[in-house]
Amino acid sequence: VRFTNAYAACHVSSPTRASLMTGRYPASIRLTDWLPGRKNWPFQRLLNAPVEQHLPFEEITVAETLRDNGYATAIIGKWHLGKGDSNPLAHGFDEHIPLGYNEGWPQGYYAPFRLNGYEGEEGEYLTDVMTREATKYIEEHKDGPFFLYMSHFAVHDPIQGRKDLVEKYRRKLATMHYEGDPYILEGNPDDPDPLTRGELDSLVHTKAYQGYRVLPQRTVKIKQHQDNIEFAAMVEAMDESLGITVPVALHLDHGS
């Protein structure tokens, strides 16, 4: 799949979500990193910008605008724009599933989910459950205007694919062959004494750099071929979800 005309306001989630909700650039609302933000490292040349810990209350969201104009509004899935008082219900949403869970990611993708009391049934997969909740919401609100913000927890840590899809990609991986180093090293741009390309290439084969750990002081590892079958399975499960929920919405009589 090639995305030839796509845009994201930021490379991490919280600022992009804030932009989707408000139409504002992340810097204009002082929300430029995932919440709660990252610490400063001793080797950094520049300090990280201060980050608001929630979506500012004075910002008007698309959910608020639509709710005030007669739409039913709901978010299903991940919020990650603040905790406590700065929850979806405070920013224009009538419903939030799972209610009260405002963390950045789940503890696991298989039930019990432990999402503030939202547990699921044994063996259920979180992406599929969110899909079911979305189609249920659409059906329940098909006779009037509604806004549904479908915000999957996937694809995010912990990387846990649906079992049938994991097996699918396990079989596919067994048929694939790749020659060359599994990863290369790139220097950290904040390194005060950057490693040369030759030094980086020579370090790839030392024991200290085995596996896929990130050493932020000096180097970052870049995988050269994708072999994570759990990740692939998570992506396909989310694609399946969109393939289910979008047609349900498109076939409503009033075209919501």
Predicted regions and their residues:
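Active-site-proximal alpha/beta segments of enzymes that process anionic O-linked groups
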Residues: 14-23, 51-85, 112-146
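Residue-level signal for the start and early helices of compact helical domains
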Residues: 11-12, 16, 22, 46, ...
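Active-site-proximal cap/lid insertion segments
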Residues: 1-4, 32-34, 85-86, 96-256
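Active-site neighborhood of phospho(di)ester-bond hydrolases with catalytic His/Asp-centered motifs
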Residues: 7, 74-77, 151
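Active-site segment of extracytoplasmic enzymes that catalyze sulfate/phosphate-ester chemistry
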Residues: 1-61, 65, 71, 95-96, ...
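Short, structured coil segments at secondary-structure junctions
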Residues: 91-92
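Active-site micro-motifs of SAM-dependent methyltransferase domains
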Residues: 27, 81, 155-157
